Amino acid sequence: MQSLDFDQRPILVFWESTRACLLACKHCRAEAIEQPMEGELSTAEATRFVDSLTSFGRPYPVLIITGGDVLMRSDVFALAQHARDLGIPVGMAPSVTPRLTDERIAGMRDVGVKVVSISLDGASAATHDRIRGVPGHFDDTVRALRRLVEAGFQVQVNTAVMKDNVEDLPGIVEIMKQSGVGIWEVFFLIHVGRGRDASELSPAECEDVAHFLFEASAHDLTVRTVEAPAFRRVVAERKEGSAESDGRDPVRQHYALGALYDRLTTRLYGLLGPPVSHPKAQTSGTRDGKGIIFVAHDGTVYPAGFLPIALGNVRDQPLSEIYRHHPLLRDIRAANFEGRCGVCEYRNGCGGSRSRAYAHSGNALAEDPACGYTPQALALER
């Protein structure tokens, strides 16, 4: 993935096919509703949008069909099949509701969907059901994970981490391992949508969680983050620190981590034992608007699902034109940032969360307030 020219094409195109969803998750980016919203792309408009993805040229980006709940769209399988017929890879992110039947699971497989992502936000019903807003949803989700694995999908668990559930992270890893899930994508909460009512982690807690995720990836688990690009710095530091270790614990030799890290790693090793693989933390150098682009239910294009700055609309112009030429996206890809992010030696590989910068300051190019790292350029001034 590193060889792709992100100025020309993204790796992933997220399409919010609908906002309709039966759940009421407290951290959701969308203000989800139970009926389709007026203005959603029609089948014909959605087909033209899918067709336009070929204008990026090969290799085509992966189309991730999300929502709301993708299964609330009656044409979603036909649209996925159309994308596959064009050679566009497709992933889906269905909600765990009564609509996720065995028939629809088979339907996803029949139209060529290979990767399915499911949200799991707690290691117990007490945590997960409180966040998802539906009693019994935790048990349904664990069953859904196992059903999808048994159906042959590559299954990814999405977890939105916040103060309400951060202590559950080791238990979520255990559930994933027991269910045969090999990919974990951890979303660091942003104050948008209903997420305004949930609690973001502090910079120190974000650092502790990032180091914990690196540890978790050594349990034969591919780990990625969303809106926490500083994880890439942590991965680079940890790999370098391990290589330089003099035999002492490289984490304690190189880093000043807090009690949260200690609790999470102690719990992880208590549940799963020592590492069983080399760390599989996955970083690709993408960020909002760089390798990633988001198309909303009404065709409006945003740098990412958590960055509500409208860039254009696929009803009016091809997505490739918006992605390649919009001034904000050019600035993001050129790492033209302000504050600490602007002088940081990791600004190209990391670059901070543009969504979080905007949510806190109204400026998408400002520094990421969740990062506690002091760039070398600033450290030398002290």
Give the role of each language-model region.
Residues 64, 117, 185, 224-227, ...:
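Residues embedded in well-ordered beta-strands within globular domains across many folds
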Residues 24, 58-59, 112, 180-183, ...:
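Short loop/turn motifs at secondary-structure junctions
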Residues 295-296:
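Short, acidic, Ser/Thr-enriched surface-loop or helix-capping motifs
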Residues 276, 283, 300-301, 305-382:
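Flexible mid-to-C-terminal extensions adjoining Fe-S/redox cofactors in radical SAM and related proteins
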Residues 36-37, 89, 109-111, 119-121, ...:
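Radical SAM enzyme [4Fe-4S]-AdoMet core and its adjacent flexible, acidic
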Residues 43, 73, 99-102, 125, ...:
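Structural motif corresponding to alpha-helix initiation and N-cap regions
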Residues 286-290:
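Short, small/polar residue-rich loop motifs at catalytic or cofactor-binding pockets
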Residues 1-115:
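Conserved alpha-helical substructure of the radical SAM core
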